[in-house]
């Protein structure tokens, strides 16, 4: 059987593709609008469709992962991503592109959240935030690659090439996972006596919602999605329209966002020891807040680039803290709890995208960024005050 470290590297490859798929349209919205004779706000539906499907499907992947094994679900979700990415590359109209992007989101939903839940099963709480930070490195690299390549392809190769490349990445990841994780997947298939029906799962989910800690984590995750991740989808368009970057240039600048998060993932242990979870949440919210306000009102390209870097650093200080809280809010139903966390996060993001798309077409994106920045400053303080830095007594990996 492969070690958990080896398995983590392999699922990191699938997670890379998942985040690349999520962010690949950010830098091509203007190009899509031109090709399909739509506004940039209308073209942003290719992002919101992915996000909505991604969030809703968590309600299925949670119980599915608990029933047949998280790694098995990750493998088949990755195969499905390869198929739907190929279909997306052939979409002839904006409406069909939106539908195929929704299918991509529905498939990709089975990768990262279940990977987080798998880490929660395998890694003791004391090492969990550091381990999640390493998984974060794979997702951030995927996000960076997706945002850059989406803009580059739209400008130089044609946007369809971007989805062909994604299909190839997902296929390779699925084949490698299928070949190397057979033993782990078999080991995680629960006995028939332990399986629960879907109605029982949904009853259990409602029971989770009765827990104050679960409700708090889900509330702040929805706010994070609406205030932070929704704004992230429109930063490349802001860079093009207000700072004079080309689509590929905007994608390249967005690499700095991922680089900021990647820096955090590499030094997470030291920062956690220095600031604690409360300090990380407070500083992260403040950093992202300041960067959004700068992107809203600054005019110098170098300030935009610096803001992207520090926004990435700040967001993942806050988000990694919330991820860790999600793995611990209901340890007895961790797979379902973490996918519920992801569902609410992306539902919040989809709501934020709808508001920001309308503000973009009305020319008021700067005001929306400023309001979101203020909200993130408040959110970081709220999380800092209420986060639970628990140290469980004898929590062991779940075999």
Where are these regions (language model features)?
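Helix-to-loop junctions at the C-terminal end of transmembrane segments
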Residues: 58-69, 264-276, 360-361
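C-terminal transmembrane helical hairpin of 12-TM major facilitator-type secondary transporters
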Residues: 278-322
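Paired small-residue
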Residues: 80, 84, 95-103, 302-310
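Juxtamembrane intracellular "pre-TM" segments in multi-pass secondary transporters
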Residues: 182-217
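Conserved MFS/SLC helix-loop-helix module at the cytosolic interface between two early adjacent transmembrane helices
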Residues: 56-95
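A late C-terminal transmembrane helix in Major Facilitator Superfamily
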Residues: 328-363
């Amino acid at each position: 059987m492969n070690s958990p470290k080896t398995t983590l590297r392999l699922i990191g490859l699938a997670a890379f593709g998942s985040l690349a798929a999520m962010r690949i349209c950010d830098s091509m919205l203007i190009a899509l609008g031109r090709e399909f004779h739509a506004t940039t706000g209308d073209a942003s539906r290719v992002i919101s469709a992915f996000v909505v499907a991604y969030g809703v499907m968590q309600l299925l992947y949670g119980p599915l992962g608990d029933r047949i094994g998280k790694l098995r679900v990750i493998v088949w979700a990755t195969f499905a991503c390869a198929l739907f990415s190929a279909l997306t590359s052939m979409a002839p109209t904006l409406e069909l592109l939106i539908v195929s992007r929704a299918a991509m989101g529905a498939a990709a939903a089975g990768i990262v959240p279940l990977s987080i839940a798998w880490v929660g099963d395998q890694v003791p709480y004391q090492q969990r935030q550091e381990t999640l930070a390493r998984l974060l490195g794979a997702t951030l690299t995927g996000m960076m690659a997706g945002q850059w390549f989406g803009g580059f392809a739209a400008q130089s190769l044609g946007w369809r090439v971007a989805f062909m490349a994604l299909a190839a990445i997902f296929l390779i990841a699925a084949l490698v996972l299928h070949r190397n994780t057979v033993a782990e997947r078999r080991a995680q298939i629960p006995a028939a006596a332990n399986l629960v029906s879907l109605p029982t799962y949904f009853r259990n989910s409602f029971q989770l919602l009765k827990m104050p800690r679960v409700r708090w984590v889900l509330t702040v995750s929805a706010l994070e999605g609406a205030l932070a991740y929704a704004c992230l989808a429109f930063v490349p368009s802001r860079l093009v329209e207000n700072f004079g970057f080309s689509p590929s240039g905007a994608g390249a600048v967005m690499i700095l966002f991922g680089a900021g998060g990647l820096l955090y993932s590499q030094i997470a242990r030291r920062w956690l020891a220095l600031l604690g979870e409360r300090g990380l949440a407070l500083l992260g919210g403040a950093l992202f807040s300041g960067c959004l306000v700068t992107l809203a009102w600054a005019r110098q390209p170098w300030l935009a680039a610096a803001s992207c870097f520090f926004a990435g650093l700040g967001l993942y200080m806050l988000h990694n803290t919330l991820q860790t809280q999600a793995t611990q809010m209901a340890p007895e139903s961790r797979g379902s709890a973490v996918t519920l966390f992801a569902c609410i996060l992306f539902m919040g993001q989809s709501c934020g995208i709808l508001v920001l798309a309308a503000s973009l077409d009305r020319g008021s994106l700067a005001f929306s960024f400023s309001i979101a920045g203020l909200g993130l400053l408040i959110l970081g303080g709220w999380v800092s005050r209420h986060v639970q830095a628990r140290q469980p007594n004898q929590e062991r990996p779940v075999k």
